Regions:
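Short, well-structured secondary-structure segments
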Residues: 1-90, 114-117, 137-142, 250
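Acidic, His- and aromatic-enriched active-site or binding-groove loops in soluble protein domains
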Residues: 61-78, 99, 111, 132-153, ...
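Generic structural signal for well-ordered alpha-helices
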Residues: 26-30, 62-66, 95-105, 128, ...
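Active-site and substrate-binding clefts of carbohydrate-active enzymes
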Residues: 1-21, 34, 155-157, 161-165, ...
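Alpha-helical scaffold elements lining the catalytic groove of polysaccharide deacetylases
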Residues: 84-107, 165-205, 224-227, 278, ...
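Short, charged, surface-exposed secondary-structure boundary motifs
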Residues: 87-89, 147-155, 177-179, 260
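Short, solvent-exposed loop/turn segments at secondary-structure junctions
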Residues: 48-52, 81-84, 121-124, 145-146, ...
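A conserved hydrophobic secondary-structure block that centers on an alpha-helix together
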Residues: 92, 96-121, 126-130
Length: 397
């Protein structure tokens, strides 16, 4: 019946993580906002696929996010709907997914994202061009040393090829103190207290006014369990920040108030993963490269399909997690497979079946010229809608 999903496992995973991490973390963040007279602010990025799973298995998480949204101290960022690698594999698919995600966020929370956060903070000059064309004012990415050199990540930068697109760069030290080292008993700074953390931020060089702490949401309650003190640590941050004249800002607020100090050039995609800060965790071996190639080969035909099930399966097949599970670089804590080869075999079996379904609708015998003509029409319609929306917004201002 071409049904590829383990609904029982999906439900178990989502309900478990919602109970251990999402709900207690959201309650803590809401308390931080209310207890500190809206001094604390936070931005969220949720993929469309993630939102769909929450709608099915943990709708209380979305209700709590809406409650946070109503405080005015929260910003929702745009990203790819499928948490995919479309930005480096298929520009048209990337644009379609971002538009789809923006509509989903707007429908749920009543706000249209102004700032973009790509899957795993992946960024390059070419990607910045696509993000600019989609109408975003800024983007979040990694403050990779091999890109920055002597420069500090603690400023606003701009895209080298689209200077109108502003960039916020992740501060590795202050992000990973929380996401990786917080519960490391061998770390010289252990135990990390809110006082110590804020004092270290205060000690950064004068003029470096923006510290971007980006982390996986599961840091709160899952990667660091409640008994590590992670929730108490977070709850204490606003009061120590205020004592040290450190404020919290949303990405769009920073972009509105701050001019870029310089541009950065990133000819090859970088990410926030591993020491290399590249894309090798998803595309570093032949298994991953073959799966990604095979996936992208059929994208044009899928975009012409009207079948709802094919469209849905296409989105879920593009999740970057599938490729991450095939990585041979390191042990994968979150993989449901015993090894990368099982992950590859299962994915390719599903993808092969999916390709047969697509071929039944648009056989490979159809000439590429005919396909391209249809796709160009669809693409032009999408671009025209984006242009008209921009004109409408400008007229409202």
């Amino acid at each position: 019946d071409h049904y590829y999903y383990d609904d029982f496992e999906n439900e178990r995973t989502i309900t478990d993580i919602a109970e251990r991490s999402y709900m207690p973390a959201l309650n803590a963040l809401l308390d931080m906002i209310k207890a500190n007279d809206q001094y604390f602010k936070v931005a969220f990025s949720l993929s469309g696929v993630g939102i769909e799973q929450l709608e099915m298995h943990a709708p209380q998480v979305l209700d709590k996010l809406q409650e946070l949204n109503e405080t005015g101290c929260v910003e929702f960022l745009a990203e790819t709907y499928a948490h995919s690698l479309a930005s480096i594999g298929d520009p048209e698919e990337f644009k379609a997914q971002v538009r789809m995600h923006t509509e989903k966020v707007k429908a749920l929370f009543g706000v249209e994202p102004k700032v973009f956060r790509n899957t795993e903070l992946i960024y390059s000059d070419d990607i910045s061009e696509l993000v600019y064309e989609l109408g975003f004012e800024g983007m979040l990415t990694e403050g990779a040393k091999h890109v920055l050199g002597w420069k500090s990540p603690n400023y606003v930068y701009a895209s080298a090829i689209r200077p109108q697109l502003k960039l916020l760069l992740k501060n590795d030290r202050f992000s990973e103190d929380l996401s990786i080292r917080f519960d490391d008993h061998s770390w010289k700074e252990y135990p990390l207290t809110a006082d110590k953390y804020i004092s270290a931020i205060s000690a950064t060089a004068e003029g470096e006014k923006i510290i971007n702490a980006f982390m996986n949401y599961e840091v709160l309650g899952s990667m660091h369990a409640a008994d590590t003190g992670i929730f108490d640590f977070f709850k204490a941050l606003p009061q120590y920040a205020e004592r040290n004249d450190i404020t919290f800002s949303l990405p769009s607020e920073i972009f509105a108030q701050t001019r870029p100090v310089d541009s950065i050039s990133v000819p090859y995609p970088m990410s926030w993963v591993d020491e290399e800060k590249d894309c090798s965790s998803w595309l570093g071996n032949v298994l991953q490269q073959e799966a990604f190639r095979k996936l992208n080969e059929i994208s044009e035909r899928v975009r012409l399909c009207e079948n709802r099930r094919i469209k849905q399966d296409w989105i879920y097949l593009q999740s970057s997690d599938h490729l991450y599970y095939m990585s041979t670089k390191h042990y994968n804590l979150f993989s449901p497979y015993d090894n990368p080869y099982d992950a590859f075999n299962n994915y390719m079996n599903v993808l092969s079946d999916f390709i047969l379904r697509v071929e039944a609708q648009f056989p490979s015998s159809i000439e590429n010229e005919e396909l391209n003509s249809l796709l160009t029409t669809i693409q032009n319609q999408g671009d025209e809608i984006t242009r008209l929306k921009k004109e409408l917004e400008a007229a409202r201002k």
